[in-house]
């Protein structure tokens, strides 16, 4: 009986050890012509305190897009992407603006602008490891904002400035990087970590040092978590904010992303991201700003992403 018990324990222990030690080579699979539906829902809440004021701002962005693989390369793939639905809402003590590509455009200029951005194609490249290497032809998003479509020059300039933070090149790259899991070059086991780094300007120059973990894996699915430390890369860099204000920034924070992936294809199916940043910006003297003005800023961002192959 003791021998039987010993053999049973040995079999169970060996089975557990084999399962725990299983290795996975995580990477994206690409095929020319494959098409994916991508959806994003993100909210950003800002608490700003400055000389004589205390203000809360909130921005909500929701988009649906179609991504098509146009070319497969040894390193990855080149995609063509276009928005099929866009909406944003911005609220603060001074204003409340709703913009919806599916809303009435006859009397609503913001809706008309969103509608004009639908179907405008641009490109990005993605490596097998999940690095977003380039964003190209983003200027096509604004190609519908023309006099022929009923927009005057002032409207075009003003709206492009206000939408740059959500739909500019840097913002799009950041959203793709958060939605796409970054994989290691080597094989990985459950519970082990790997690192990646991203740098973006939105327009604030930020760097995120990510520690990724394969939290769980059971064919055909797995869960991956990224825990990232956010810092400002250049606290002396002067950035431009709407409507033409100049400022320097200094932020630190944390971003956590949890993604459910397909082990066979490497593609994330759903992702949830949360980020918090704290610090300050200094509005530089000039125009309506008589002297440098320091403002303490807290930012909380909550975002969800979903990707589905058509």
Where does each model-flagged region fall?
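Bacterial Sec-dependent N-terminal signal peptides
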Residues: 1-26
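Signature of exported/secreted
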Residues: 21-310
């Amino acid at each position: 009986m003791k021998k039987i018990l010993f053999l049973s324990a040995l079999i169970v222990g060996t089975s557990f050890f084999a399962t725990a030690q299983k290795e996975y080579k995580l990477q994206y699979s690409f095929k020319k012509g494959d098409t994916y539906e991508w959806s994003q829902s993100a909210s950003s809440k800002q608490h700003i305190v400055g000389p004589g004021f205390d203000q809360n701002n909130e921005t909500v962005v929701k988009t649906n897009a179609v991504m098509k693989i146009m070319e497969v390369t040894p390193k990855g793939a080149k995609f063509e992407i276009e928005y099929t639905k866009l909406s944003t809402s911005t609220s603060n003590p001074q204003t409340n603006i709703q913009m919806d590509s599916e809303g009435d455009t006859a009397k609503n200029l913001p809706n008309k602008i969103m509608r004009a951005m639908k179907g405008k194609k641009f490109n990005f490249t993605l490596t097998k490891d999940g690095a977003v290497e380039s964003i190209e032809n983003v200027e096509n998003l604004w190609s519908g904002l023309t006099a022929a479509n009923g927009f005057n020059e002032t409207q075009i300039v003003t709206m492009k400035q206000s939408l740059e933070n959500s739909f500019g090149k840097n913002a799009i790259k950041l959203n793709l990087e958060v939605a796409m899991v970054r994989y290691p070059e080597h094989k990985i086991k459950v519970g082990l970590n790997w690192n990646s780094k991203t740098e973006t300007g939105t327009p604030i120059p930020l760097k995120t040092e990510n520690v990724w973990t394969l939290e769980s894996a059971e064919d055909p699915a797995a869960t991956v978590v990224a825990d990232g430390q956010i810092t400002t890369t250049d606290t002396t860099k002067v950035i431009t904010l709407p409507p033409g204000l100049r400022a320097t920034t200094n932020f630190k924070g944390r971003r956590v992303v949890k993604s459910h992936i397909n082990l066979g294809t490497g593609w994330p199916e759903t992702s949830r991201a949360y980020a918090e940043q704290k610090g300050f910006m200094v509005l530089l003297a000039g125009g309506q700003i008589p002297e440098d003005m320091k403002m303490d800023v807290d930012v909380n961002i909550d975002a969800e992403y979903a990707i589905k192959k058509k």
